[in-house]
Amino acid sequence: ISAGFIFVIVILILQGFLVSFGQEQENRLVAALLDPFGDMALDYYTRYWTVAEQNELYIPIKGVFIYNRLIWLTIGLAVFISIYKLFAFSQNAFTFSFRKKDSVRFTKSNFGGITKIDLPKINLSFSGKTKFNLLWRLSNIDFLYIIKSWPFISIVIVGLLLNLVGLFELGNIFGTATLPRTWRMLEAGAPFTLAINICTFLYAGLLIHRSRISNVNQLIDTTPTPNWILLGSKFLAIVKMQIVLLSLIMITGIIFQIYKGYYDFQIGLYVYELIVLNLIYYVIWALLSFFVQTLIPNPYLGLFVMIVLLIGIPLTSIAGIEQSIFKYNQGPGFSYSDMNGYGSGLENYFVYKIYWLCLGIVFYILTILFYNRGISNGLKEKFKIARSRFNGKNPFFLS
C-alpha cells in the first residue's frame, strides 16, 4: 500500500512541476510530452483557442498528444511486464538498509529456576516540567520515525530533484540569464509546497494511527499520559518535519547560488520567509489534518480527503464562494522585491493567517476531544466520549 501511495504522490509532484515548467514558451513541447495525464499535451494545441473554437472544434487527437500517450503506454507496459516476470507469491518482501544487521543467537540459561531481578527504585513525578519534558521526548521519537521512513525519503528526493530543475530553469527568462537572487531561489521552491503538504497529511494520519497499526494501542492507552501530550508530541513532530523540509529549500538555494558564483545569500530573508511566513501556512493545514485523521480510521483515506480539500477549496469560487474568509487557509499572499521588500502586503497576510490559525486551534481542541483512546465502536460512541471530555478549559478555548 505504501509503495502505491508513494508512486501516486510522485506522479502528482511531477504533474505539478510540469505545469509550472510548461509556462515558459520554450518548455511547452517537453512538458507536453512528459505529462503523465496528457493535460499538457492537449493544452499544447488548445491554449490559445477562442471560446468559439472551444465550442466547435474537436479534441485534437494528433501529433504531440499521440506521442505523449505512446510514451506513457510504453512506460506502463514496461513496468507491468517487469513486475509480471519478477513477481512470485512465495517471495519475501524486498527490504533495503544501509546498515547490516548482525544475527544474534539467544540461549536460554535459567532452566529449572527463577531468575531474581532487583528492580530499581523510582519516584513518580507528574509535574508540569515532567510533562513538557515527556512531550519533547515523544516528539523526537515520532520525528525520527518520520524522517527514517521510505515514503518520506522518496517524496523528499523527488521534490528536491524537481526543485533543482526549477532552479536551473528559473535562472533564464526567455533565454536571458539572470542573477540568482535569494528571492528568486525562494520562488523556485514553490513546487516543493505540494511535497510538504502531502508529507503533512500522510504522517499526521500515520502518527495518529501508529499505535493501532503496530497493535500496541491498548498498551499505550493504559498509560497515565494525558491526551494533550500524546497528540502534542505528534503535532510537534510534524512541525519539526515541516521546518526540516523548508530548510532544504534554503540549502538547495544556497548550493545553487554557490554553483553560479553568487555569494550574497541573504540568510535573514531565507529564514524570515521560510520559517516565519511559510511555516504558518503549513501549520494551519496540519491542525486540520489532525482533526480529519482522528475522525477517519484509515490514514490513507484521510490523506485522500485532505488532498481533495487542498485542491477543492480554491475551486469553490466556481460555486460562488469568492471571499477568502470562507475558504480555509486562503487569503492574500505576499511578494518580495529588491526595491521595496515585502511592501505593505504583509499586514493583510498576517491578519488572514491569524484568523485561520484560530480556527485551526479550534480543530485541534476538537481533535483532543475526539481522540480515540481505548476501544470504541464507531462515530456515535466518539461523540459520546467527546461530550464527556467537554469540561474544564475546553469550552473556554472553543468560545
Over which residues does each language-model region extend?
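Catalytic cores of nucleotide-enabled group-transfer and carboxylate-activating enzymes in metabolic
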Residues: 13, 126-135, 140-156, 160-176, ...
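Transmembrane helix boundary and interhelical loop/hinge segments in multi-pass membrane proteins
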Residues: 176-189, 201-226
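Hydrophobic/aromatic residues in alpha-helical transmembrane segments
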Residues: 83, 200-204, 216, 284, ...
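Secretory targeting signals
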Residues: 1-3, 9-32, 36-40, 167-172, ...
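Terminal transmembrane helical anchor/hairpin motif
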Residues: 4-86, 93-94, 262, 299-389, ...
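Aromatic- and glycine-rich beta-strand/loop motifs that create alpha-glucan
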Residues: 91, 110-158, 375-395
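Residue-level hotspots within the lipid-embedded alpha helices of multi-pass solute transporters
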Residues: 69, 73, 163, 191-194, ...
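Amphipathic cytosolic juxtamembrane alpha-helices at the membrane-cytosol interface
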Residues: 221-237
